[in-house]
């Protein structure tokens, strides 16, 4: 409403469309928007401020009971079942690319990530880099608080986070509300915490490519070594994303793009992986993360363990997911 009163909105609608909307309808609309948090009023601002203050203390589980079990015993059984869904063996990872897609859609891809984690010695810390699905004030952000999981809180590595923040030309600890419902950290962290219960975590989100982040992480990793995890998904195709309903041709193109991207990363050639995508017509959402972490991916060779393009039947759309170890 841009600071205008309901009467002014009523007048503007009448001028533009010749329709006099009853004030009661406008009041009901404003109330509904306020309750949904879509209209910034004093009440909504106060609620957001309260949420932000809570997030500065801890990040609660948002998807427990929906995407994974809330209880530890059930969560352990969940991990075992997902590992069983992948029949192969893993390889030790210094860098791991894994999904953040709803686990039930790609169980064998998460299972491949668990197989890799089985072969990886427990790290002191995990650099978990996800994709921001909400706007950030800066190119990237971190939330230096415990993240709750069924296996107990994943504690932040504050010294490493502070060292990273000191090297960046922007404030790293920005936009805490962007972490409130961010599944690109919560879902991978469930699997990582289950496998490495003692590891500290650096929870990072990337909104736009940030070469500065990659360079700073390269420096910080020398003093604070750990496992680097890219929590990214691959192609997004179909009506949900602006395409026609999924066809064999579209699915083949999405798979070709996904595997070409992953295989070039596995050859230690991240620039070639990005160049292969061109304008990214199948909307691989890991592009900004990979572009930000180039210094950490160059000349690191590895192996693609799993890939799947998963159909979302109600919308005839599909999303790709993969697991890659470097």
Swiss-Prot record:
InterPro entries given in the database record: MEMO1_fam
Superkingdom: Bacteria
Family: Belongs to the MEMO1 family.
Name assigned to this protein: MEMO1 family protein TTHA0924
Species of the source: Thermus thermophilus (strain ATCC 27634 / DSM 579 / HB8)
